[in-house]
Amino acid sequence: MVIFINRFSKTILLFFGMLVFVFLLGFGITALYFRSTAANLYVQARNSIDSSFNSAKAFANALANSANQFSKSSITNNLDQVKKDLEQSLQKVDEYKKNLESQNNLGNISQEKIRELDATKKDLENSKTQLDNFKNNLDKNGTASSSPSVKKQATADGVISAVSEFSTQAQSIVSSYEKIKNNIPSSEQFNNYYDVTMITIVAVSGGMLAILITTIVFSFLTSKKRGLIRFSRFISTEQLADHVNDILDRYPDLEEEVITALDHD
């Protein structure tokens, strides 16, 4: 019974061992067969990661710039356009004044019209000067007024501070994301790792299967059965006798029965 259990346990272990190596061998061969498909899937995944990183980085950079520019960027663009329109108006006023003066020389235009035109030109020039001062103050202080109220300034400063703080956090997250992304293998590295790993799996599992099968075949061809026990064909008579003596020493009652049976024979 003990011999049967021992042989059965070894058979089960051998069977499951071979099953595991057969699975690994099949997995490795299948993976090598679909190597190009795996490479394409990895490239798509890597491109998706790169795209999402670039989007996140662009957002973080835009956010960082907006912390200093959001309070004046849109105003500055509009002021430039207004200033351009004022300069065009002044140019037209000068042209109109020259035309009036030429008409005045002919006695067709009164001095009152020219004075009204001069007043209009002066108003435009004052507006242009105020606009320049307004824009310069905006570029210098980042606010639309040289003397903003305390409440409005505190609100603006609070918004800028909040945006700056969030921008710092976003930059930190993007930096950590970039470190992780840089540690992800490139497509070339992935192909190398993939090939080496799968070839190793195939070689090791195939080699172990070959060893197990060779061992089983060799054991079967070089063994002989004596009763319930199978011995190697290369075992000597002395080794067999020693083995029997070990069994008899372990079971004294059995030894007496064997000796009695031999005596009767």
Swiss-Prot record:
Residues 72-141 form a coiled coil. Keywords: Cell membrane, Coiled coil, Membrane, Transmembrane, Transmembrane helix. Disruption phenotype: Not essential, it can be deleted. Residues 131-151 are annotated as: Disordered. GO terms for cellular component: plasma membrane. The chain crosses the membrane at residues 12-32, 201-221. It holds the Pfam family MG280. It is a multi-pass membrane protein. Signal peptide: none annotated. It is found in: Cell membrane. This is Uncharacterized protein MG280. The lineage of its organism: Bacteria, Bacillati, Mycoplasmatota, Mycoplasmoidales, Mycoplasmoidaceae.
